[in-house]
């Protein structure tokens, strides 16, 4: 079976990356070695799969939802001993390899409508860690989301997502990806980013992570308001004011002006549940 008769399906969010330069940059960013096993999410027609198989990686394990594409991928790569394929929804399908092991790196062209849930599954949440931790994830995302993930405090794109992701992983830009690099072209700009999740010893203790989550939820639901107004409803002002001052936070700041580490310091100083 060839892919020539298969058209992109909007319900699956299918936009196939076809730009050779971007495909090469994705593989290069993963820095694949002979002992690496790669989880590829949404291989589509196999343009990236082909390059991954040309790398030194020991194993490429792909998960594809579209049954027609699964047949085409089997026809194209089924004879490759280093390739395995699972049909299913990546939000629900087992992520382990066919032999029961786990990939240590992820490469994914994520359907933009499942970005949040998929990030949570692959990297976890502050108060719900994922095991095992991947060495790195190279992800093709909608530019707006990618910018929020790696935004700096004070930028309009800095959000609760920024804080969460920056407490879970090192985040960096690989390359911008304009719509013309896809078939069919999406209506939005995209970016490839590299995430390097922190090992367990660098992650927040669960109780502290839960307090950070509660603070973020409370503060960012009214992101244009000063912290004096958003946090006073859940923290006694007589506690909040000296605590904020002790960790270098001004209560006249808005939540998008406070760095991830400062949120942790604020949560650490609380002796009560938020």
Swiss-Prot record:
> Is this entry keyworded rRNA processing?
yes
**What Pfam families does the record point to?**
RrnaAD
- Keyword list, A-Z: Cytoplasm, Methyltransferase, RNA-binding, rRNA processing, S-adenosyl-L-methionine, Transferase
Looking up PROSITE patterns in the UniProt record yields:
RRNA_A_DIMETH, SAM_RNA_A_N6_MT
Database matches in InterPro entries: KsgA/Erm, rRNA_Ade_diMease-like_C, rRNA_Ade_Mease_Trfase_CS, rRNA_Ade_methylase_Trfase_N, rRNA_adenine_dimethylase, SAM-dependent_MTases_sf
Top-level class of the enzyme under EC nomenclature = transferase
Please give the SUPFAM superfamilies that the UniProt record associates with this protein: S-adenosyl-L-methionine-dependent methyltransferases
Q: Which SMART domains match?
A: rADc (SM00650)
* Enzyme Commission identifier(s): 2.1.1.182
Domain of life the protein comes from: Bacteria
Any one GO MF term held by the record is: 16S rRNA (adenine(1518)-N(6)/adenine(1519)-N(6))-dimethyltransferase activity
Compartments annotated for it: namely: Cytoplasm
CDD domains (alphabetical)? AdoMet_MTases
Q: Which reaction does it catalyse?
A: adenosine(1518)/adenosine(1519) in 16S rRNA + 4 S-adenosyl-L-methionine = N(6)-dimethyladenosine(1518)/N(6)-dimethyladenosine(1519) in 16S rRNA + 4 S-adenosyl-L-homocysteine + 4 H(+)
Cite the binding residues for S-adenosyl-L-methionine: 15, 17, 42, 64, 89, 109
> Is RNA-binding there in the keyword field?
yes
Instruction: Tell me a GO cellular component.
Output: cytosol
The family classification in the record reads: Belongs to the class I-like SAM-binding methyltransferase superfamily. rRNA adenine N(6)-methyltransferase family. RsmA subfamily.
Q: What does this protein do?
A: Specifically dimethylates two adjacent adenosines (A1518 and A1519) in the loop of a conserved hairpin near the 3'-end of 16S rRNA in the 30S particle. May play a critical role in biogenesis of 30S subunits.
Q: What is this protein called?
A: Ribosomal RNA small subunit methyltransferase A
* Organism annotation: Synechococcus sp. (strain CC9902)
Classification from the root reads: Bacteria, Bacillati, Cyanobacteriota, Cyanophyceae, Synechococcales
What gene does the UniProt entry assign to this protein?
rsmA
């Amino acid at each position: 079976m060839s892919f020539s008769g298969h058209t992109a399906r909007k319900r699956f969010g299918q936009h196939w990356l076809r730009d050779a330069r971007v495909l090469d940059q994705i593989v290069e960013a993963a820095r694949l070695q002979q002992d690496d096993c790669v989880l590829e999410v949404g291989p589509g027609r196999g343009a990236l799969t082909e390059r991954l198989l040309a790398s030194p990686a020991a194993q490429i394990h792909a998960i594809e939802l579209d049954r027609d594409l699964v047949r085409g991928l089997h026809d194209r790569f089924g004879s490759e001993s280093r390739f395995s394929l699972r049909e299913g929804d990546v939000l629900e399908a087992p992520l382990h390899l066919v032999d029961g092991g786990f990939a240590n790196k992820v490469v994914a062209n994520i359907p933009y409508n499942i970005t949040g849930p998929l990030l949570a599954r692959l990297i976890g949440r502050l108060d719900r860690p994922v095991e095992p931790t991947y060495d790195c994830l190279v992800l093709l995302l909608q530019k707006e989301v990618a910018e929020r993930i790696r935004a700096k405090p004070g930028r309009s794109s800095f959000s609760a997502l920024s804080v969460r992701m920056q407490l879970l992983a090192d985040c960096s830009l690989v390359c911008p990806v304009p719509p013309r690099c896809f078939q069919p072209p999406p209506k939005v700009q995209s970016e490839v980013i590299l995430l390097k999740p922190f090992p367990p010893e660098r992650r927040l203790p669960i109780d502290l992570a839960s307090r950070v989550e509660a603070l973020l939820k409370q503060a960012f639901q009214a992101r244009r308001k000063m912290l004096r107004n958003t946090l006073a409803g859940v923290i006694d002002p007589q506690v909040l004011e000296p605590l904020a001052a002790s960790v270098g936070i001004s209560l006249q700041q808005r939540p998008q002006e406070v760095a991830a580490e400062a949120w942790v310091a604020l949560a650490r100083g609380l002796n009560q549940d938020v």
